[in-house]
Regions:
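Alpha-helical transmembrane segments and their immediate juxtamembrane cytosolic regions
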Residues: 1-206
Length: 206
């Protein structure tokens, strides 16, 4: 529970801080001042490429190099070129998506992010239910032909980036009482969900 449940809070936290410090100022400027966003995307792209080169010998030694061009781009754009590097393409792609959608309409951004997150959740934590429905399983098989996970910048990242943008606005912040009660209650529900989805073998990836 602590390793595969509580430990997984880290990436959503990092995504929310990105929304808070990078995307919120872009929105506050009326979507005109792109400098901070462009700098963030450039720095993370360079970090991702550097990490990819660093882990290349390990991938080569382990026999995990992509076997064709499709697998290469799948790893580079969605899955990450090494297991834990999926965060980089997720935050880069997620930022681009949210920036485009939010500039058009914050409402459109929230609608997309909510639907995408539910689709992603069904393809990960609750895939054990989805695979029992042939039509839905076929749809997800199509998704998994492009990305091995729904835990990526299309499905997973946008909702947390938008949440970070939302709490950057003082009017959206919770009271101390709500935080004091909301945190422990939400952690309890998180642990219950993690325990049950593992116990019932619903998770596609732990």
């Amino acid at each position: 529970l602590f390793t595969y449940c509580l430990g997984r809070i880290a990436v959503p936290f990092f995504l929310m801080t990105t929304g808070f410090f990078v995307l919120a100022p872009y929105a506050k400027s009326g979507f005109r001042d792109k400098r901070r966003l462009v700098r963030f995307l450039r720095q993370n792209t360079l970090l991702y490429l550097a990490a990819t080169l660093f882990y290349f010998p390990i991938n080569w030694y382990a026999g995990n190099l992509p076997k064709n061009v499709l697998e290469f781009f799948k790893a580079l754009l969605f899955d990450g070129t090494f297991y834990h590097l999926w965060y980089f393409p997720a935050v880069i792609l997620g930022c681009l998506l949210v920036a485009i959608l939010a500039k058009r309409s914050m409402r459109a951004g929230w609608i997309y992010a909510g639907i995408a997150y539910l689709i992603g959740l069904a393809g990960d934590s609750y895939y054990g239910l989805i695979q029992q429905i042939p039509a839905l399983k076929a749809c997800y098989d199509g998704i998994f032909s492009i990305s091995n996970y729904t835990r990526n910048g299309i499905f997973f990242a946008p909702i947390y980036l938008l949440l970070g943008m939302a709490i950057a606005n003082p009017r959206n912040r919770c009271s101390k009482t709500a935080c004091r009660w909301g945190l422990p209650i939400s952690v309890v529900f998180l642990l219950i969900e993690g325990y049950l989805t593992d116990l019932l073998h619903l998770q596609r990836h732990n």
